Amino acid sequence: MGVHELTHPLVRHKIGLMREADISTKKFRELAAELARLLAYEACGDFPLEVRTITGWDGNPVEIEQIKGKKVTVVPILRAGIGMLDGVLDMIPNAKVSVVGLARNEETLEAHTYLEKFVDKLDERLAVILDPMLATGGSMEATISMLKRNGCRQIRVLALVAAPEGLARVTAAHPDVDIYVAAIDRCLNEHGYILPGLGDAGDKIFGTK
């Protein structure tokens, strides 16, 4: 368990492109989806496999490996987490989708919940939470707590950028949760934004200001 920062050159390159001040909505979305795929690839690296026998192209039996009985629910935190959803579903197409809506109070920097919609049988599923920016950690801590209250015991987090302060908060509250992140940045500013960060990921994904 712990924090896993991806160091692959493709990840470093793509997260760097996302930091451009004048990046277009289209490009930001594309890069968010690409990085989500790479994060999902890394987060699924320990999935167990089983051998199955199928009929090959020539009519003869072929032994293949498939992921063994892993039930997954992907949990985007609204609204920015939606920008990572398609990329993760490209890699885990059979996953079911749960949704959590959280809004941050800009004065206290704490999150409050306005939507909670989980799939069934959470106690049998691995939940993969999506949030581009793990800043103060308040939204992530709250989402993990919600999942656990609803019976989920296997949880992983995918984030594009994280602040050390947010990582410290989440790992202290939930040391049993693995966090996969494309970049760990320097710090938070006085408004709770990550530096150097990406800016407001939700605005950049949805083209709003």
Swiss-Prot record:
InterPro entries: PRibTrfase_dom, PRTase-like, Upp_B, UPRTase/APRTase, Ura_phspho_trans. HAMAP family: Upp_B. Keywords: Allosteric enzyme, Glycosyltransferase, GTP-binding, Magnesium, Nucleotide-binding, Transferase. One of its GO terms (biological process) is UMP salvage. This is Uracil phosphoribosyltransferase. Belongs to the UPRTase family. The keyword Metal-binding does not apply. Catalyzes the conversion of uracil and 5-phospho-alpha-D-ribose 1-diphosphate (PRPP) to UMP and diphosphate. Its EC number is 2.4.2.9. Uracil binds at I194, G199, D200, A201. It is an enzyme of class 2 (transferase). Pathway: Pyrimidine metabolism; UMP biosynthesis via salvage pathway; UMP from uracil: step 1/1. Its cofactor is Mg(2+). Binds 1 Mg(2+) ion per subunit. The magnesium is bound as Mg-PRPP. 5-phospho-alpha-D-ribose 1-diphosphate binds at R79, R104, D131, P132, M133, L134, A135, T136, G137, G138, S139, D200. It comes from Geobacter sulfurreducens (strain ATCC 51573 / DSM 12127 / PCA). It catalyses: UMP + diphosphate = 5-phospho-alpha-D-ribose 1-diphosphate + uracil. One of its GO terms (molecular function) is GTP binding. Allosterically activated by GTP. The keyword Cytoplasm does not apply.
